[in-house]
């Protein structure tokens, strides 16, 4: 028997055109021969009997019943005057979505489409404008402010009712999404809510909240494929402890007050690009399992990403932080981009770990920049960075290349105890001392590379230091170049040079370079006696106010030209117990 196309319109039934043309079914105007009339009538009776049976199957009856319940629930849900009735409609709609998704008599695509239509109805309610949303913070206060327009008490009640209905929708969706996620992810704790068996197809549905006015808390809820693009959050936006599955978008969202994503979990891609946070933005302890984009975001209030974990790429390119930004103990497994970012307040990256490349090129730090005790596992790119106040890299480790070429440092730069295991480039960098403001009075104006360790080549060629710079106890394991650098004063007491050192075309404006021990706790600068004597080059520019005073020193039957007071050492004479080299030459003279 050919497949029937059924239409409920006016009780008519339509047969496929192909079946009519093939003669399998009667068509308009068909008249059987007299000898076939009895046989044809019998066949038609069988056909319509089968059709009635097909129409009245339990599955068909259930589906028709759902459509009727949907119509009734929708009428309840759209009732704008009775919150209890609206809530009843919302519960029914959510339950109907469950029923469609678990109806195995239908193909998956049909089940998904029926459920998606219901979800679109619910999310459409969330997107509906609500005039009182903009007055949320006023209406949530205890007393009406002076000059309030309208009935304050009545508006308070109306706002609470609308908040209840809309948040209940999120809670009903969250309950189902949490159950589905908990059943598919091993090790997850079971959700505190109990629910009947749910279809995993809930995870395939789309939840469009784009452009919605959100004026209620959404903490500790579950979201799936949630689109909050261009949404406006009135009053505090609370996503504390929320869990997001599927791609999530907050692109161009407007947060009019404080926003909390503290402890939130983003299990897939999330985008906040072009969003605006007017108040404080709290992402401390948040977990990002996939790529996260905060590109071009504006943070007007304080931003807190302390203890945040990014397991993939983290993109903050061209973002603007107008107040303090706390990224202390940040952990990024993928490429972290802060390129061309503007930090208006203090930027703190203390004890952070960047496992892959970290890009800060062309960023501007208007207040102190603190990277102390951080670890850069991949290339650290700070080319062209501008720091207008102190820059703190004390105890920082650079496991790969560190590029500060063309960087501009102002006031106080501290690389004390930093370790550079890859090539370190400071070529054309500027270390500038500007007139102090009251805010900067506690910081001496100099650059500090004391105890810094450079395991590979170090390049300070054409760098400019308009403040005194100290390389006390610095360790240059391989070649270091200061070719063309400009100094006010440079101090290399107790520094160790393992291979070549190029000081040609240097300039010293106020104080001659010092390689001698100025204090008891310091020793003279040391140059390896196993290096090429031609690799140590000391030649100031003719116009330099101060130059090098050089002499000779001998060790291992080799003679070197060194600055007066510096010594040669034998790298093979290291005494582990005494923590010093035991074969040292007399000072150069």
List the predicted regions and their residue ranges:
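Short intrinsically disordered, low-complexity coil segments enriched in acidic
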Residues: 2-4, 40, 63, 112
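Short, low-complexity intrinsically disordered segments enriched in A/P/G/S/L with frequent Arg
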Residues: 2-3, 16, 23-28, 32-33
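Intrinsically disordered, low-complexity regions enriched for glutamine and histidine
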Residues: 3, 19, 34-37, 51-52, ...
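General secretory precursor processing signal
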Residues: 11-13, 553
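Generic alpha-helical structural signal
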Residues: 24, 28, 36, 563-565, ...
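Membrane-proximal alpha-helical anchors
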Residues: 35-102
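N-terminal leader/targeting and pre-domain segments
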Residues: 68-75, 81-91, 99-589
